[in-house]
Amino acid sequence: MLVTDKKQEIITSFKRHDSDTGSPEVQIAILTERIIYLTEHFKVHKKDHHSRRGLLKIVGQRRRLLDYLKKKDVERYRAIIEKLGIRR
């Protein structure tokens, strides 16, 4: 589960300006953290198919945000991929 402190830390490291909480970079970083958490969860709980479906939904949402960012600004896209270490 993504606790408030961790979420705030992610927002601070990826924000574009002081009051930024919803830019694509911030959203992608938060989704990536949730994906990492769920991946670790499935190593222990292999039969949790309900949450696995949620993971697939989150991955799709992140993919759509990345596609949007790639169309909008390629440099920002490359920077976020590099910073998060996402394979694309």
Swiss-Prot record:
PROSITE patterns linked: RIBOSOMAL_S15
UniProt-listed GO biological process terms: translation
CDD domains cross-referenced by the UniProt entry: Ribosomal_S15p_S13e
InterPro entries noted in UniProt: Ribosomal_uS15 (IPR000589), Ribosomal_uS15_bac-type (IPR005290), uS15_NS1_RNA-bd_sf (IPR009068)
One Pfam family here: Ribosomal_S15
Protein family per UniProt: Belongs to the universal ribosomal protein uS15 family.
PANTHER family: RIBOSOMAL PROTEIN S15, BACTERIAL AND ORGANELLAR, SMALL RIBOSOMAL SUBUNIT PROTEIN US15M
Alphabetized HAMAP family for the sequence: Ribosomal_uS15_B (MF_01343_B)
Subunit structure and binding partners: Part of the 30S ribosomal subunit. Forms a bridge to the 50S subunit in the 70S ribosome, contacting the 23S rRNA.
Full protein name: Small ribosomal subunit protein uS15
